[in-house]
């Protein structure tokens, strides 16, 4: 399908480039991703250009840039975060390191009466999502300030005559109130007609699969039972016919309680017939004494390939005629450093070196790799899956192994004193640094830092959100904040690192806790109100062999940003009572961290 009116998104390697494209598509305009090194003739083909965010600083040597000739094309241009700063620098403005940085929610304030078409239907006070360590301190000639935030003097700027705009916040994420309104305003400025929808993606993707996969080739599809792999499997079956796609499920020993049997029943109902292999002993053996999150993910990814190879041999399949199918979605690739300028936040199990080599050899097919979770769900419904099915909580491909933390990381006395000093101004709140670390993301870069636990004086959620956001923004050694529900005095508790083995005993413990939590939220009718709720096992207790559980309920749409779910106290209390009935569980924590700075999963 030839589309003459479209918007280019120039990728500078941030987490958000493809998300921008996705959001524009959902607003009914077609988008394509371009590199920042395209010839000027390529940029000239578009009705509008968006310069994405990125993990670099525009003043760093060799940081990615773009030709200044794009500003002479007469095409509307929107810069977002890094893209905004790059426009300012290239046209004569000044960008410097910010004094504090800005991560998470901020309030957008309009500047005087400088109304502008890019902010049509904005009234001021809208929440926007920030994720930056640099800021613009001087505008180029011809630009004016349109809006600002508490910590950002130039949150929105414009050169109205040239239709060039810059915004410091991320309008493309769901947590920016009216973000879609701003993007739709830009679409209107570009004069782009509504030419895109998920139904068109389906038609184009089926055609692409049929043209890409040779007639003699078949697909070996790794199905976890999650939404992504299931939708991928159905899409491949629709494009190629079910006889050319083999669904294969590996029981790793790190699946949820009764998952394999449940999945077989549910997928059979959808006419999906799986071959199941129990490889739990191999996974337990290979992960013994392992703790580093990157190493764990890479081991899991390689074990999946080993299991696949054995299955190919045992099933007497012609290896050369088979492609590996994966349910990879875009956040998996971008968090694994999947674009030229991106930083690795975490290596996903389907992006380990062995699989990367297969991808380079053309032996992997990933039919939904450019989609986000919300789009995958829409596609699933279009393919005939029930809404209840596609609405299930996301579950990581490696399973519970990424929800079992094993790395000890003690905070320093100096760090604790800094935390104490800040919290002393917060009306009775106190905190302790837990001796563990988790993966997070700050300014599009991976962070691996400590977690702080706060006491509970039944402070309202908004105040806890503010304090948690401030802690993770202000202190570089913190990227996650949790609450110890219904416990006002932390001094009486001794949070010791007790160690963790990725074995059947610990996975059974987490399986039981996970099942307990899900049972409560389903009983109370909350399951569909929470986007995802990882239940995490921590090696924290007072005695040897004791562990702790973290509740991580979040609200999100696309997994690129998220905020913690404000749970009713009565619900939290019921969950705590039920979970602490499990003998080995000593503490129950509640995660107060937004994304950024913390990833949804702890590893």
UniProtKB/Swiss-Prot annotation:
It holds the Pfam family GATase. Pathway: Purine metabolism; GMP biosynthesis; GMP from XMP (L-Gln route): step 1/1. One of its GO terms (biological process) is GMP biosynthetic process. InterPro entries: Class_I_gatase-like, GATASE, GMP_synth_C, GMP_synth_GATase, GMPS_ATP_PPase_dom, NAD/GMP_synthase, Rossmann-like_a/b/a_fold. Residues 6-195 form the Glutamine amidotransferase type-1 domain. ATP binds at residues 224-230. GO terms for molecular function: ATP binding; GMP synthase activity. One of its GO terms (cellular component) is cytosol. Keywords: ATP-binding, Glutamine amidotransferase, GMP biosynthesis, Ligase, Nucleotide-binding, Purine biosynthesis. The keyword Ligase applies. Homodimer. This is Probable GMP synthase [glutamine-hydrolyzing].
């Amino acid at each position: 399908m030839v589309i003459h009116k479209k918007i280019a998104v120039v990728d500078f390697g941030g987490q958000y480039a493809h998300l921008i494209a996705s959001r524009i598509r959902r607003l009914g305009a077609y988008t394509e991703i371009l590199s920042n090194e395209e010839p000027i003739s390529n940029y000239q083909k578009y009705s509008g250009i968006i310069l994405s965010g990125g993990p670099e600083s525009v003043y760093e040597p060799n940081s990615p840039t773009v030709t200044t000739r794009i500003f002479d094309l007469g095409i509307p241009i929107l810069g977002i975060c890094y893209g905004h700063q790059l426009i300012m620098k290239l046209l004569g403005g000044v960008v410097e390191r910010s004094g504090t940085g800005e991560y998470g929610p901020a309030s957008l304030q309009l500047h005087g009466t400088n109304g502008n078409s890019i902010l049509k239907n904005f009234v001021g006070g809208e929440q926007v999502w920030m994720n930056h360590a640099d800021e613009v301190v001087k505008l180029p000639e011809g630009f004016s300030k349109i809006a600002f935030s508490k910590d950002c003097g130039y949150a929105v700027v414009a050169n109205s005559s040239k239709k060039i705009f810059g915004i410091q916040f991320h309008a493309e994420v769901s947590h920016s109130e009216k973000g879609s309104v701003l993007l739709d305003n830009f679409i209107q400025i570009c004069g782009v007609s509504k030419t895109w929808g998920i139904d068109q993606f389906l038609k184009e993707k089926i055609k692409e699969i049929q043209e890409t996969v040779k007639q003699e080739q078949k697909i070996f599809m790794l199905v976890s039972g999650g939404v992504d792999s299931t939708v991928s499997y159905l899409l491949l079956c629709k494009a190629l016919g079910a006889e050319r796609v083999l669904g294969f499920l590996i029981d790793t020993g790190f699946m949820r309680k009764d998952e394999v049997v449940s999945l077989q029943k549910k997928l059979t109902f959808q006419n999906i017939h799986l071959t199941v292999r129990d490889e739990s002993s191999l996974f337990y053996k290979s992960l013994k004494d392992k703790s580093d999150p990157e190493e764990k993910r890479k081991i899991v990814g390689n074990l999946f390939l080993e299991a696949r190879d054995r299955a190919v041999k045992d099933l007497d399949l012609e290896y050369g005629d088979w492609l590996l199918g994966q349910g990879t979605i875009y956040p998996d690739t971008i968090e694994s450093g999947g674009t030229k300028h991106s930083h690795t936040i975490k290596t996903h199990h389907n992006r380990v070196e062995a699989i990367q080599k297969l991808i380079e050899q053309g032996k992997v097919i990933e039919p939904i790799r450019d989609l986000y979770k919300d789009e995958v769900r829409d596609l699933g419904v279009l393919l005939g899956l029930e809404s209840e099915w596609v609405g299930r909580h996301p579950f990581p491909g490696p399973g519970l192994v990424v929800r079992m933390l094993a790395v000890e990381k003690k905070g320093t006395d100096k760090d604790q004193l800094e935390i104490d000093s800040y919290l002393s101004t917060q009306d009775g709140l106190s905190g302790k640094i837990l001796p563990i670390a988790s993966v997070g993301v700050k300014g599009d870069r991976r962070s691996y830092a400590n977690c702080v636990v706060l006491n509970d004086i039944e402070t309202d959620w908004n105040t806890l959100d503010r304090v948690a956001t401030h802690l993770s923004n202000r202190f570089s050694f913190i990227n996650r904040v949790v609450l110890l529900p219904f416990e006002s005095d932390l001094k009486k508790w001794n949070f010791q690192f007790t160690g963790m083995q990725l074995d059947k005993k610990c996975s059974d413990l987490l399986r039981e806790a996970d099942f307990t939590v899900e049972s409560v939220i389903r009983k109370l009718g909350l399951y569909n109100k929470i986007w995802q709720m990882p239940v995490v096992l921590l090696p924290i207790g007072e005695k040897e062999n004791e562990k702790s559980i973290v509740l991580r309920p979040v609200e999100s749409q696309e997994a690129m940003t998220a905020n913690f779910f404000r749970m009713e106290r009565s619900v939290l209390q019921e969950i705590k009572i039920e979970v602490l009935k499990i003998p080995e569980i000593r503490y129950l924590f509640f995660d107060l961290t937004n994304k950024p700075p913390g990833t949804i999963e702890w590893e």
